[in-house]
């Protein structure tokens, strides 16, 4: 359910999409955004995709920009290019379903001590973290945060750290979207662990938070197999966390496999766990 209240007159919003090789899902993503949002501009920051991502973005009238530094660079660049007071980060594998999400999110962001509003996937019971799959933020605040350009899988750590420092909270809107998900290849957990270590340093609390996030991600999948796999996945993540020099240099694109439908069996031994690129499903807490 959304946040109760009378819908305000909603100002148009710049929609920010960071992506790579998302031709399979991008059309549905952008079509849903245009259907349910008062879009002012769609700004796509692409990591030089090798499929039809760029052509699809242009067909929807999106402004297309390219980067090779990392998702941290894409996150900041998109906000710099935007002009609206609030910006909506949208992942290319997220399909917005709720016509009321944006009005709910605008009202929530206006509440005291609120720094971000996250849309939750349909059917997901557990809320956590600060992914950027469907997330409304104040543009000026995003630009005030120093996110390293080469941040790969832990760029939101810097946003979460700022919220904690400012004593602001994340609010959530349930039943907002479907996350089609991206299945990850061998070494994905280790790579995530390495990126977390590089962002947060050696921190016991960060390790504990990581385990809890993984557990909640798997619980949201409602798959006993995924839940039982949690300790094994966490051990893989710890391997990357404790030896970041070995795992950090892998290009993010080499550990990303093909897009697929929810519930489809993953091609690797690991269960189908989404990066957050989409909903609240992010391995980095």
List the predicted regions and their residue ranges.
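Acidic helix N-cap motif at the loop->helix transition within catalytic regions
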Residues: 24-27, 51-59
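Conserved donor NDP-sugar-binding/catalytic core segment of glycosyltransferases
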Residues: 95, 99-129
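Non-catalytic, C-terminal membrane-associated alpha-helical segments of glycosyltransferases
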Residues: 184-285
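Short, acidic, metal-binding catalytic loop of nucleotide-sugar glycosyltransferases
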Residues: 31-40
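Short aromatic/hydrophobic "clamp" motif used to bind/position activated sugar donors
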Residues: 87
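A conserved acidic beta->alpha catalytic loop
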Residues: 46-54, 95
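Glycine-rich, basic loop-to-helix element that forms the pyrophosphate-binding segment
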Residues: 66-82, 129
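Acidic donor-binding loop at a coil-to-helix junction in glycosyltransferase catalytic cores
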Residues: 152-161
């Amino acid at each position: 359910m959304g946040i109760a209240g009378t819908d305000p007159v909603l100002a148009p919003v710049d929609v920010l999409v960071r992506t790579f090789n998302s031709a399979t899902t991008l059309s549905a993503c952008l079509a849903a955004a245009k259907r349910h949002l008062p879009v002012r501009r769609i700004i796509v920051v692409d990591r030089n995709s090798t499929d039809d991502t760029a052509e699809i973005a242009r067909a929807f009238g999106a402004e297309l920009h390219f980067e090779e530094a990392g998702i941290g660079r894409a996150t900041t660049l998109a906000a710099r290019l935007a002009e609206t007071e609030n910006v909506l980060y949208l992942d290319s594998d997220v399909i917005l379903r709720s016509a009321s999400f944006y009005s709910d999110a605008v009202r929530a962001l206006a509440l005291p001590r609120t720094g971000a509003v996250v849309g939750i996937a349909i059917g997901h019971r557990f809320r956590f973290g600060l992914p950027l799959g469907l997330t409304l933020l104040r543009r000026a605040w995003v630009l005030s945060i120093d996110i390293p350009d080469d941040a790969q899988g832990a760029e939101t750590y810097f946003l979460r750290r700022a919220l904690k420092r400012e004593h602001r909270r994340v609010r959530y809107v349930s039943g907002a979207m479907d996350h089609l998900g991206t299945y990850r290849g061998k070494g994905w957990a280790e790579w995530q662990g390495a990126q977390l270590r590089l962002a947060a340093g050696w921190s016991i609390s960060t390790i504990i938070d990581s385990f809890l996030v993984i557990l909640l991600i798997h619980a949201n999948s409602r798959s006993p197999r995924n839940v039982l796999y949690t300790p094994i996945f966490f051990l893989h993540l710890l391997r990357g966390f404790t030896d970041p020099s070995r795992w950090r240099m892998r290009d993010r694109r080499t550990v990303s496999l093909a897009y697929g439908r929810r519930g489809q069996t993953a091609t690797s031994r690991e269960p189908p766990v989404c990066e957050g690129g989409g909903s609240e499903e992010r391995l980095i807490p």
